Every structure is written in C-alpha cells, then in structure tokens.
C-alpha cells in the first residue's frame, strides 16, 4: 500500500507540475495587463519539445546528457517520500529532512556542472549563479529545519508535521519564526523574482538550459516544475499539515484534493509576489538573504533559551 501511494504521489506531482507552471505564466500576463497563454500551454510545449530532434554540443561530456534524467529522478523520488496525502510518509527513507537537503544539493550540483560543461558562456555563468544561490539559501533552510527538528525530536518530515498539527511542540514561537524563515527560503528555492538569477531571461537567456533541446529540454522543464511542487509540498507538510488524515487509506483521495488546493493557494501567492517586484542586482542578493538567515537563527535562539 505504501509503495502504491508513493508512486501515486510521484505521478500526481508529475501531472500537475505543468499546470502550476502554466498558472504562473497566466498570473504574470494578467498582472502585466496582457492576454497571455492558456493555463495548459506548458503541456503543449512539452509535447512539442518531445517531438523535436535533440542536438548536443560536441564539446560537452556525459554530464550534460545525464543531468535531465537525474534531475527528474530526484524530483520524482522526493515526491514519493514526502507526506503529501497523509500525515505519514509513504517512503520514510526519502522523507527525512537531511535526505531531502542532500538530494536537492545533488540535483543542483549537476545542474550547475552541466552549465559549465556545455562550453556555453551564458550557461556557465548561470551555473555559477546557481551555486551561489545554494550558498545563500541553504543556511537558512538548514537552521530552520534544525530548529523544528529539535522542537519535534526528529528530522523526519512526517513526524514534524504530526507534532505541529497536534500542538505537541516545546516552543511555539520558535516554530512560527522557523516557518517564516523556511517559507522565505522555499520562495528563493522556487527561483521566483527577484531570485531567478541562474535563468535570468534578460541577462543569461535561460542559463544552464541554453544548450538543451528537444526531449532533454522537455525533461528538464518538467523536472524543474516538479521540483517547485516538491518544495511547496515540503513546506506545507511541515508547517501547514492540517487537512491530512493520520493513516493511509481511502481518505487519502480526499486529502489529495486538499493538498492540491494548498499548492494552488501557495503558487498564486508566489505568482503575485513574483510579479510585484523586480529582479535584484546580482551583487546585492546576499543582503536580502542574510535577513532570512537572521530570522532562522533567532528561532534557534528561542529554542535554546526555552521561549
């Protein structure tokens, strides 16, 4: 039953990822007073890319070729492990905070490395920026997760959500502050404005994706959309776990609808925020991200002093 639910979660995330990326395009168009594409346009784009031939630079190595399937596999694996439809993780080995951090770091490393490997100047700069973003994002994520892990007594995402939904936490203030910091870090991880530095359209022309085409580009776009859904699910599983049944069963079908509604609300909020700001200068990103680190550290201090 667990493996069936895990596969179902992965397939649902794969199916809805283009919908949520299309939703972001629709919100951008409406806020820019344009008609914009259909909300289903990303599905059509993926179908077109899958039908096109693929061209690979003769200067690139195997890294560029294995990166799209690796990125897709990591996103699917994390979707299988997170407690999306119930308060229990279908595959706890993939639902641990440390495992998730390392898996995201692995996909990010190969994503950046493929940009450098492609011998394209834009892709190389995009890869370097991707690594810089990881340095700026991961400290706040780690500190916020470590704070909640101390409060809940476990690094398992399902256990964290169960403690929070029942109110069985030793420091409510610390959990709230950690949630604020983690929400901000997740927003940065989504690559929304002003933090879309690696694929900055006006500057780097899609960055590490510049040398991909055909099925590889389709696979990569799908994987990046899945990663966004996984990151949103990661946040909701810990800090907004309400509406999910405690056990795996038929009620998981209703919970799947609740999960999709949560994701819809989160993506709408992120879409509005993204189109309400402009892209930050690359050199001042650190000034913005360190504020999030400060909030996460403050949450940890509250746990230490017992507030």
Where in the sequence are the language-model features?
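Membrane-interface amphipathic/juxtamembrane segments adjacent to transmembrane helices
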Residues: 24-53
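Juxtamembrane boundary at the C-terminal end of a transmembrane helix
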Residues: 299-307
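Transmembrane alpha-helix boundary signature
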Residues: 54-57, 76-91, 111-120, 150, ...
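Alpha-helical transmembrane segments
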Residues: 6-17, 92-105, 167-188, 252-255
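Mid-bilayer segments of alpha-helical transmembrane spans in multi-pass integral membrane proteins
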Residues: 80, 99-114, 135-148, 152
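Cytosolic juxtamembrane amphipathic/interface segments immediately preceding
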Residues: 45-63, 121-125, 208, 212-216
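Juxtamembrane/interfacial segments at transmembrane-helix boundaries in multi-pass membrane proteins
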Residues: 90-93, 148-175
């Amino acid at each position: 039953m667990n493996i069936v639910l895990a596969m179902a979660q992965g397939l649902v995330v794969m199916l809805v990822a283009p919908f949520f990326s299309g939703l972001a395009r629709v919100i951008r168009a409406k806020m820019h007073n344009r008609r914009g594409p259909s909300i289903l346009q990303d599905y059509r784009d993926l179908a077109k890319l899958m039908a096109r031939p693929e061209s690979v630079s003769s200067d690139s190595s195997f890294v560029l070729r294995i990166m799209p399937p690796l990125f897709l596999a990591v996103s699917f694996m994390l979707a299988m492990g997170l407690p999306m439809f119930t308060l229990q993780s279908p595959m706890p080995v993939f639902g641990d905070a440390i495992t998730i951090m390392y898996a995201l770091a692995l996909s990010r490393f190969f994503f950046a490395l493929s940009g450098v490997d492609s011998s394209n100047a834009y892709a190389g700069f995009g890869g370097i920026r991707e690594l810089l973003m990881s340095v700026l994002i991961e400290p706040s994520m780690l500190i916020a997760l470590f704070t909640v892990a101390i409060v809940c007594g476990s690094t398992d995402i399902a256990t964290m959500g169960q403690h929070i939904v029942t109110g069985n936490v030793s420091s409510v203030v610390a959990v709230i502050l950690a949630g604020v910091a983690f929400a901000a870090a997740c927003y940065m991880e989504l690559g929304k404005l002003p933090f879309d530095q690696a694929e900055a359209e006006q500057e780097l022309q899609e960055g590490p994706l510049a040398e991909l085409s055909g099925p590889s580009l389709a696979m990569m776009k799908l994987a990046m959309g899945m990663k966004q859904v996984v990151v949103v699910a990661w946040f909701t599983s810990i800090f907004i776990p309400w509406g999910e049944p405690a056990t795996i069963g038929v009620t998981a079908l209703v919970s799947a609808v609740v999960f999709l509604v949560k994701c819809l609300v989160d993506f709408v909020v992120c879409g509005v925020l993204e189109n309400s700001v402009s892209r930050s200068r690359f050199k001042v990103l650190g000034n913005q991200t360190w504020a999030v680190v400060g909030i996460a550290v403050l949450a940890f201090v509250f746990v230490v002093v017992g507030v």
